[in-house]
A protein has these predicted regions:
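Short, surface-exposed charged micro-motifs
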Residues: 241, 257, 324-326, 352
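Anionic N-terminal interaction surfaces
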Residues: 268-326
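Soluble catalytic domains of membrane acyltransferases
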Residues: 2-196, 212-213, 220, 235-236, ...
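Acidic, Ser/Thr- and proline-rich intrinsically disordered linker/docking segments
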Residues: 347-396
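A broadly conserved sequence feature marking short terminus-proximal activation segments
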Residues: 172-232, 237-239, 369-386
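Short hydrophobic/aromatic-rich beta-strand segments that constitute the beta-sheet cores
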Residues: 69, 260, 334-338, 363
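Phosphoinositide-dependent membrane-docking surfaces
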Residues: 46, 327-360
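Cys/His-rich short segments
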Residues: 218-271
Length: 396
């Protein structure tokens, strides 16, 4: 008999009786149109695309079964929130300081115990409205355990509240179980086929879908704070000099201007595209070019000051260390100035770099685990894309 965790019965009781009561209230609050599905067999790995911070609630409203969420450690930074989540849901926490093997093995052990696991396959909310990179190890996990696989797709979530947005737009969100691949089906599939099915089922391009649906997502200030995602000027090619107000975006270094409409599309006489995914492809190339063209390794390529720099300790608690920190990108390194000291590390030596919330950069080195938040909108992706490029990877 498989041994279950001590509080498994309590948590399962909460989910069985409380979730169905709260789900209709949640759906009305977020404009979510659910399509309830009761799994035909267990255990399973439930994977979803990630469009919004409310996605776990959307998944829970659609799939009537108990499962353990995989959560990033930034969600659990507050001890109060961490204890509440552990009481009602027992999430599997993916700590940034750990290697990917740790969370993989935790999911593996959980599934082998017969307990379902839910995972946001992209690992973070989409920046662009298009489904991003999905790790192949998710397919490896399914094949190693021999469990079922449920693919759950969310549409409308990104345009309801784009990653940069300060306000939620009025518009519908939909969820659906695309397919439940049973254990028997998984046994007949290769790892490649499982991975291809996962990527296919979860793919969403919010802009291409809305080009057909023409659904309005209305906000008073639809462009406000888009600097969290948009950093490359389509006209002069500078990085980190874009600003927004109301429905407008402009560049400090030239006369570039753009506006965004109620359907989420961007318009300017100086750019060939009208969607964030296309804009993002362009601006990533600006970062690559900036690094390639730099000749002095000590030349600051991009810099942001007035950063809130915190340190995460071994318990997962976060402590503010400096309210006036600085983050810098160089040709082959990244630097954080904080609390009278400098943490500068070669991109190739960075243990892990991540991006959470709207603009928090997570930086793990051999010596420290930092969280760099910002007082004013700025794109964390500048540093993420830059460091990954130093490591030899172009960010998808």
């Amino acid at each position: 008999m498989k041994q279950m965790p001590n509080n498994f019965r309590r948590v399962k009781f909460i989910w069985k009786y409380l979730a169905p009561v709260l789900s209709p209230i949640f759906c009305k609050l977020f404009g979510f149109h659910r399509s309830v599905y009761k799994p035909v067999e267990e255990p399973f790995l439930l994977v979803s695309n990630h469009t919004d911070g409310a996605d776990p609630g959307f998944v829970l409203s659609d799939v009537r079964a108990y499962f353990r969420f995989v959560s990033s450690d930034h969600v659990m930074e507050s001890p109060v929130i961490r204890n509440v989540f552990r009481f009602i849901g027992r999430p599997l926490i993916n700590y940034q300081k750990d290697s990917s093997d740790v969370i993989y093995n935790n999911m593996l052990e959980t599934l082998k115990r017969g307990i379902n696991v839910q995972l946001m396959a992209e690992a973070r909310v989409t920046d662009t409205g298009e489904t991003g990179y999905i790790s192949r190890r998710n397919a490896t996990l399914v094949k190693e355990v021999g469990c079922g696989l449920i693919t759950h797709r969310i549409t409308g979530g990104y345009l309801t509240i784009p990653r940069w947005a300060d306000e939620r737009r009025k518009g519908p969100v939909y969820g659906e179980v695309v397919h439940h691949y049973t254990k028997a089906e998984i046994a007949q599939m290769s790892e490649d086929e499982v991975y291809e099915a996962m990527c296919r089922d979860l793919y969403v391009n919010a802009y291409e879908e809305n080009r057909v649906k023409k659904q309005k997502y209305i906000a008073e200030n639809p462009a406000q704070s888009a600097e969290y995602v948009l950093y490359g000027c389509p006209k002069c090619g500078t990085v980190g000099k874009l600003h927004t107000k109301h429905d407008k975006l402009w560049c400090d270094c030239c006369d570039f201007e753009a506006t965004v409409d109620d359907y989420g599309f961007w318009h300017s006489k100086d750019m060939e595209w009208d969607t964030i995914p296309e804009w993002d492809k362009y601006q990533k190339e600006l970062i690559y070019r900036l690094i390639d063209n730099a000749t002095d390794p000590d030349e600051v390529l991009v810099e942001h000051d007035e950063q809130l720099v915190s340190v995460m300790d071994e318990k997962g608690d976060v402590h503010l260390a400096d309210e006036h920190g600085v983050i810098r990108l160089y040709k082959d390194s990244i630097e954080v100035l904080w609390d009278g000291k400098s943490t500068r590390v070669k991109g190739t030596d960075v243990k892990k770099i991540s991006y959470s919330s709207k603009g928090t950069v997570g930086l793990v080195t051999d010596d420290v685990n930092l969280r760099i938040k910002t007082k004013e909108p700025r794109a964390a992706n500048i540093y993420l894309v830059g460091v990954r490029y130093m490591k030899g990877h172009k960010t998808i």
